[in-house]
Amino acid sequence: MTFNDILHKFRSESFTQKDKGTQFERLMRSWLLSDPRYSNLTKVWLWDDFPSRADLGGKDTGIDLVARTEEGDYWAIQCKCYKEDSVIDKPAVDSFLATSSRQFKDPETLQTTSFAKRMWISTTNHWGKNAEDAIQNQNPPFNRVGLVDLQNSPVDWQLLIDGLKGKEAMLPGKQPREHQLRAMSAAHAYFQEHDRGKLIMACGTGKTYTALKIAEDLLNNKGLVLFMVPSISLLGQSLNAWCADAVNPIKGICICSDSRASRKIKKDFDDTQDSVCLLYTSPSPRDMRRSR
């Protein structure tokens, strides 16, 4: 069952919009606890189950899920099961921005804290200009998960519907092909005697995947890798692919030198709506600020 099949099922079988929204929120909770890009999440609450919701108004005023990371940061998450051609307008995001700006007591430490990230999950990628303007340069930062990101997630959606999550809900992993195995073997032998080298492969032969497997082999699935790319879009594509195919979870620290990266540049191929916006780092930006 594909993600599109799930959407069709929700839309055709739900009695009300609220019923459809509730099913979607529960599915997104399971997805966040399964997709390897979010492996640093230790807990994801439905809004009604979040212990500190009273500090944020109690009622459902824009936040659908709350997630906690390994580092103790909290994310405010909104889930919208829209039609694919729907356009998100500013009123739709205003209450989410307002509620996620408030402070609350950390359920673990009982200390006053605030959200470190905002995440907006929706089944449409269309944003109105006023809504687009409203989410720029926000603190905490605003990150988007769109339809394409959900469709390309390496999870088995049927297993999520059946109640499984985590590694049990992942699609079967890739296996290296013969030409990739030869490249991996050659790289392993080469780096026994050299500090640097170059691997040249044709388009469509799996360079990103082969590079991942070479890195895992050289580092024995632990250590640090410096991965440099010339554009934001390649950063997003590469890290998404590595997270999906890695043997062990990857903790990525994404650093961008492009001053335009925080703005939407319509004429730039590296549009900030690219899925790189969805990649989360460990340590968190908040922890990195503390260490300065």
Residue ranges of each PLM-predicted region?
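Conserved pre-motif I regulatory segment
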Residues: E168-G197
